[in-house]
Amino acid sequence: MPGVVFDLDGTLVHSAPDIHAAVNKALAEEGGAPFTLAEITGFIGNGVPVLIQRVLAARGEAPDAHRQAELQGRFMAHYEADPATLTSVYPGAEAAIRHLRAEGWRIGLCTNKPVGASRQILSLFGLLELFDAIIGGESLPQRKPDPAPLRATAAALNEEVVLYVGDSEVDAATAEAAGLRFALFTEGYRHAPVHELPHHGLFSHHDELQDLLRRLLA
């Protein structure tokens, strides 16, 4: 059977609340004002370094490598210590992946989240065993939307990957650059209207994924 690759944040798990909490904990240590959940959700998608860059820019701080590294380190310490208290798996996501595996599909994960945190979250929800390959934000020099991470995930699966499943502009651009079909989960963290994102199919609940795959492969 061929392979299918998933994004993580905003596609399989609603992780923004824990990311939000970790950012605000790091800022509180220095007396910084908290961000709202909506603000932090808007910063998610391009990996931790860009998340912290956006936090600092929103605070009106000029770019500074030392400041970036310092805040990023404290954010990661808080996040890795407590990555899933407020996080939830999207309804139907686990069942959809288990069904795919039962049919013989190879399953990959391509995310801009660090591999350690990704594995930790998947393990806490009993999902880690379902993935045959995981590529994260530090696995390669490039991050999504560069196609290299998605291509590396596909290569690690040793199967023809027929679909990338994601939720955002970053994911759509990654699939397009890699020359793969893209299925858009509409309930994630995208900013643009659906019609502005290149996609081959879309779904609002993971229960719909099986039928979508069948239509795309017909």
UniProtKB/Swiss-Prot annotation:
Pathway per the UniProt entry: Organic acid metabolism; glycolate biosynthesis; glycolate from 2-phosphoglycolate: step 1/1
Active site: 7
Single GO term (MF): phosphoglycolate phosphatase activity
Catalytic reaction(s) noted: 2-phosphoglycolate + H2O = glycolate + phosphate
UniProt cross-references to InterPro entries, sorted A to Z: HAD-like_hydrolase_sf (IPR050155), HAD-like_sf (IPR036412), HAD-SF_hydro_IA (IPR006439), HAD_sf (IPR023214), PGP-like_dom2 (IPR023198), PGPase_prok (IPR037512)
Requisite cofactors: Mg(2+)
EC number: 3.1.3.18
A Pfam family per the record: Hydrolase
Gene Ontology CC entries for this record: cytosol
Residues noted as binding Mg(2+) in the record, renumbered to the chain: 7, 9, 167
Keywords: Carbohydrate metabolism, Hydrolase, Magnesium, Metal-binding
Annotated GO biological process: carbohydrate metabolic process; DNA repair; glycolate biosynthetic process
CDD domains, A to Z: HAD_PGPase
Magnesium in keyword set: yes
Keyword Chaperone applies: no
Domain of life: Bacteria
Primary role: Specifically catalyzes the dephosphorylation of 2-phosphoglycolate. Is involved in the dissimilation of the intracellular 2-phosphoglycolate formed during the DNA repair of 3'-phosphoglycolate ends, a major class of DNA lesions induced by oxidative stress.
Membership in a protein family: Belongs to the HAD-like hydrolase superfamily. CbbY/CbbZ/Gph/YieH family.
PANTHER family the UniProt entry points to: PHOSPHOGLYCOLATE PHOSPHATASE
Identification of the protein by name: Phosphoglycolate phosphatase
